[in-house]
């Protein structure tokens, strides 16, 4: 294509000289269209002007310093990009219009950097993709016909044409409608539940709902047909998921070196604060549709009803559905979804398309529950009388709003500050004293054969303990105890939140933390396990009789009071006191293999936990010496877990069989805490499967043992 074909016929220029062709190489084709054509190139490029005349500087001259500067486009179109010419921000650009290819004018594709190879193309510069869509949307909007009594009328879906769709949500029309279109195919309380999962961004802009402002009730059914034509024109124009403005992202405030990283970070934050809080009703909340189970999650600022299943959508600004809606809405069930329909729920939730989460995630009130909607008092009893409602009474019911989420009562919980750990720990923990107490307990309780097996297991890891601790000074030992207390501080929250019976003990076997479920299962109180109350247990799981307290080495004397170590601290209960003989031996043999072995390893096996039984419990169950006063004393010293469920003391001569018949089991096998207490009621042992692992400190020394138990039912 020649220059004459592009710019028209060449006009004769009397001042044109051969010197006029000495122009810079970067003169654009747009500049060539505004300046006079010069003589053919290659003729006397170095000749001087004749008769001393000089060519006047025009505004289009590339060397003119006063010429208007052309603003560089943020992204050139494909044609200008291939031609290496200056393009404009408008689409189609002026160069493509002159060439007659305005229909093919679209943004060019830039070469991505290496660190953006995995990024989708639409996510690199999303805020520049609205120009093409806006032009197409404006064209489609002006060509949508709406038939009303045989006449065509244009509906103003939006108050004004926007140069960019980012400002759409700032100019939303008023949600109240004079006369909306309602269908008799369904009632508002039986809306189909929309699936939040959406592989594509299929937000439906319903002009049949939003374009009915100011129209009478006799609006023809052709609105629904026009809505189907308008969906293609507005679906991608005003709801582009790659635009950060739709999600209220302020990318400039994010301290990221690249645009894609900031967009990804903002998207994750949006998912955590929006879709993560109320996944079942999040998609319905933002656009005024009704979620599953009739939950009244809706907003007043939305004019777009969604009907994924093809059924008509309803707008909640409608004054005619207030009476039926208020009687059927269940405000207490907004977040309690129907568990019977869980199989129909999707496995993921789509990200919302509108910037609804303007509030900070740290705010007390959920941002999804801030909008309210008022309904009218005097409404039509049936939908057949909707056409006669032309005026809305001024009397209104109280404002109906969705209830707030029940937050945890943090004020009632004790304030925990990990800084107090570093201030309170002043002395190292005496593990030597703990091992001496453990050795004395093992020799006092176990038989020589079992004692020898435990001693061999501990002797195999003794050199490793000596090698790892010989270079540690006092400051290191204090720091080791601070690490232990800090780790235990983290485990306490986990134990309280987890429903599995859990205990945490030191490497000496001393109990350091215990969960409520473990106390319910075994009857051991937390204060007794931690050494804060006397340990009156006499149940050692001996073989000479059920709960006789007699082992192969003879009777085991319980602690009559709280044992005080030479260091001044109380003596917690050892792990060996909670297990029967065989389970203790197997534990220490496994501990010898795992203590300095696999740091991430764990052991899963079976054991038998010993129930907490005092002498008063033994006498009551055996039927020898029992009285009401003794039972009251037992209730103060122990847990009272073996009392009958009726709360009355057992009479003399009452057998174990009669107590066993008082157990009440549910269909699941256990009736609450009472059923958990009945486990191991007969022989004082609870057969469990348990898993435990060893956590090490910064010096690679076994620091604590975490154990989880599950009873075998």
Swiss-Prot record:
Q: Give the GO biological process terms.
A: cellular response to starvation; gluconeogenesis
For this chain, one GO molecular function annotation is:
RNA polymerase II transcription regulatory region sequence-specific DNA binding
Q: Which UniProt keywords apply?
A: Activator, DNA-binding, Gluconeogenesis, Metal-binding, Nucleus, Transcription, Transcription regulation, Zinc
SMART domains, per this entry? GAL4 (SM00066)
The domain of life for this entry's organism is Eukaryota
The record's region (Disordered) falls at 1-70, 145-229, 274-318, 541-564, 623-665
Bias (Polar residues) occurs at 19-56, 145-159, 191-212, 295-312, 541-558, 649-659
Q: Which CDD domains match?
A: GAL4
Q: Which InterPro entries match?
A: ERT1_acuK_gluconeogen_tf, PAS_13, Zn2-C6_fun-type_DNA-bd_sf, Zn2Cys6_DnaBD
Annotated localization:
Nucleus
Tell me the DNA-binding residue spans. Answer: 77-105
Known Gene3D superfamilies for this protein?
Zn(2)-C6 fungal-type DNA-binding domain
- UniProt biased composition (Low complexity): 160-171, 213-229
- The principal localisation class reads nucleus
- Annotated SUPFAM superfamilies: Zn2/Cys6 DNA-binding domain
What does this chain do? Transcription factor which regulates nonfermentable carbon utilization. Activator of gluconeogenetic genes.
What's this protein's name? Transcription activator of gluconeogenesis CPC735_053490
Which species does the entry assign this protein to? Coccidioides posadasii (strain C735)
């Amino acid at each position: 294509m020649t220059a004459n074909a592009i710019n028209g016929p060449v006009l004769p220029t009397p001042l044109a000289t051969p010197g006029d062709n000495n122009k810079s190489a970067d003169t654009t084709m747009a500049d060539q269209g505004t300046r006079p054509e010069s003589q053919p190139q290659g003729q006397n490029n170095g000749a001087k002007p004749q008769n001393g005349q000089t060519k006047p500087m025009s505004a289009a001259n590339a060397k003119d310093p006063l010429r208007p500067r052309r603003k560089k486009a943020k992204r050139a179109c494909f044609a200008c990009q291939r031609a290496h010419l200056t393009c404009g921000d408008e689409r189609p650009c002026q160069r493509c219009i002159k060439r007659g290819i305005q229909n093919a004018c679209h943004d060019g594709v830039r070469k991505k950097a290496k660190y953006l190879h995995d990024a989708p193309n639409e996510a690199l510069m999303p805020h520049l993709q609205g120009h093409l869509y806006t032009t197409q949307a404006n064209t489609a909007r002006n060509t949508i016909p709406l038939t009303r009594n045989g006449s065509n009328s244009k509906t103003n879906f939006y108050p004004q044409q926007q140069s960019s769709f980012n400002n759409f949500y700032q100019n939303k029309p008023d949600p109240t409608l004079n006369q909306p279109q309602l269908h008799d195919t369904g009632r508002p309380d039986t809306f189909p539940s929309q699936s939040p999962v959406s592989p594509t961004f299929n937000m439906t802009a319903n002009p049949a709902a939003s374009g009915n402002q100011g129209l009478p009730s006799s609006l023809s059914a052709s609105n629904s047909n026009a809505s189907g034509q308008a969906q293609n024109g507005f679906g991608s124009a005003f709801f582009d998921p790659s635009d950060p403005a739709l999600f209220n992202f302020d990318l400039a405030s994010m301290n990221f070196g690249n645009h894609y990283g900031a967009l990804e970070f903002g998207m994750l934050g949006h998912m955590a604060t929006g879709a993560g809080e109320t996944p079942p009703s999040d998609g319905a909340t933002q656009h005024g549709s009704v979620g599953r189970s009739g939950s009244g999650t809706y907003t007043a600022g939305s004019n777009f009803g969604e009907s994924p299943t093809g059924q008509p959508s309803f707008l909640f600004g409608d004054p005619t559905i207030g009476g039926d809606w208020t009687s059927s809405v269940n405000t207490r069930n907004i977040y309690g979804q129907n568990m019977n329909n869980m199989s129909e729920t999707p496995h993921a939730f789509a990200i919302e398309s509108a910037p609804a989460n303007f509030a900070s995630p740290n705010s007390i009130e959920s941002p999804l529950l801030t909008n309210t909607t008022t309904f009218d008092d005097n409404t039509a009893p049936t939908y057949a009388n909707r056409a006669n409602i032309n005026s809305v009474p001024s009397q209104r019911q109280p404002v109906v709003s969705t209830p707030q989420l029940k937050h945890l009562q943090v004020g009632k919980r004790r304030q925990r500050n990990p800084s107090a750990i570093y201030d309170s720990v002043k002395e190292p923990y005496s593990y030597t004293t703990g091992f001496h107490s453990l050795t004395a307990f093992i020799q006092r309780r176990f038989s020589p054969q079992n004692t020898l097996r435990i001693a061999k297991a501990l002797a195999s890891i003794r050199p490793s303990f000596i090698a790892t601790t010989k270079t540690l000074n006092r400051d290191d030992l204090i720091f080791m105890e601070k690490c232990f207390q800090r780790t235990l501080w983290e485990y306490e929250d986990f134990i309280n939140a987890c429903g599995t019976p859990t205990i945490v003990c030191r490497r000496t076997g001393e109990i350091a933390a215990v969960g409520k479920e473990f106390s319910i299962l075994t009857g051991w109180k937390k204060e007794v396990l931690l050494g804060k109350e006397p340990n009156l247990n006499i149940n050692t799981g001996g073989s000479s009789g059920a709960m006789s307290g007699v082992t192969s080495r003879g009777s085991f004397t319980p602690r009559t009071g709280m044992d005080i170590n030479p260091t001044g601290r109380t003596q917690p209960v050892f792990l060996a006191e909670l297990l029967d003989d065989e389970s203790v031996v197997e534990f220490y043999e496994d501990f010898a293999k795992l203590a300095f072995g696999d740091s991430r390893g764990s052991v899963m096996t079976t054991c038998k936990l010993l129930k907490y039984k005092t002498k008063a419990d033994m006498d009551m169950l055996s039927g020898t010496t029992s009285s009401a006063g003794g039972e009251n004393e037992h209730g103060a010293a122990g847990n009272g877990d073996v009392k009958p469920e009726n709360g009355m003391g057992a009479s003399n001569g009452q057998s174990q069989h009669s107590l066993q018949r008082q157990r009440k089991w549910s269909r699941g096998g256990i009736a609450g805490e009472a059923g958990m207490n009945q486990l191991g009621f007969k022989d004082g042992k609870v057969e469990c499967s348990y898993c435990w692992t060893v956590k090490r400190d910064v010096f690679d020394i076994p620091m604590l043992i975490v154990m989880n138990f599950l009873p075998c039912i």
